[in-house]
Amino acid sequence: MTAAGAVMRAGALLVAAALLAPLAAPAGTTSPLPPLSAFPRERIAVETRSARRHVFEAWRADTPDTRAQGLMFVKSLRPEQAMIFVYEPAQHVGMWMKNTLIPLDMLFVDDGGCVAKVHERARPGDLCTVESGVPVVLVVELAGGT
């Protein structure tokens, strides 16, 4: 199963990813890293148990360099924006908040499409590792509290 085609379920959530044409990204960085506008874009749909659907425009981080950069130095993230980290094949993943300026929620998605873990409101700049706990193919980062 490819990460882009995964359907993610975890009690209250159903998440589907669909590839979109690259879109311009308004969030900038204050570092020599490539701007987020250089990242490919995808649309992420999150559906609650009560069938409420939330759509996010997500930057795709699917290389070692883009996964290492993530949302570093991004000063704001609108509620409808996200970043997805793609891992193929599925693997144990550890995320941290180094050089991340905003709080984030993280969804860890296994290769069966299930959200295996949710970590809410990761603290900006925190160097503690947030572990997936199981092999995952995606990590979805959303604005903290989303």
Predicted regions and their residues:
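Compact, glycine-rich, soluble single-domain proteins
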Residues: 28-146
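Bacterial N-terminal signal peptides that target proteins for export
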Residues: 1-13
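Bacterial N-terminal signal peptides
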Residues: 11-22
